[in-house]
């Protein structure tokens, strides 16, 4: 079975042959698969391995937010053409043992509710996640791999970039293209590639 395996001791920037952290139509596929072929993909966490067990919120001061939300791939499906509908079945998902939740003032979906700084570490075992920072609570394991999507077309990139820039101009929040810590790091992908954090029409 074809696969993309992750060395969890290395950041994406140090292992760029396994993924990307920008959306762009010119990012080269890492592997090719035939329709119906199974593939094994390992994924990094949303921080690209920067949040480690035992860290405190204060340790996140040097956290590189622009390198976050790395994706594994791309995977090219042989015969697929722009505009095709792809059906992808996720046969099995396996969770890592460590997870985390962070709340930063002024950030995230609940920024208007929570104004405290907080970092919880989760241990996933026996079908539940438990955190010493939130004693007495266990959450049923609900494995979520993050984002899956298809490469945007050049036209989609331009439209989405304009839409998000307009949102920022009107006082909203969006992560605009930024070459800092982009993977792949070469141009024009680095400076024009869309950040992988927000959901869009491609995935």
Predicted features, each with a name:
Residues 1-63:
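N-terminal, Lys/Arg-enriched amphipathic/low-complexity engagement segments
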Residues 2, 8-11, 18, 24, ...:
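A short, solvent-exposed, low-complexity linear motif enriched for acidic/polar residues
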Residues 29, 71-76:
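Short, conserved secondary-structure segments in the cores of folded domains
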Residues 36, 80-83:
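Loop/turn positions that initiate beta-strands
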Residues 41, 85-88:
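A generic structural signal for residues embedded in beta-strands
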Residues 44-48, 91-96:
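Short, charged beta-turn/beta-strand-edge "cap" motif at the junction between a beta-strand
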Residues 52-68, 99-113:
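Short, compositionally biased
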Residues 92-203:
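Intrinsically disordered, low-complexity linker/loop segments enriched in Gly/Pro
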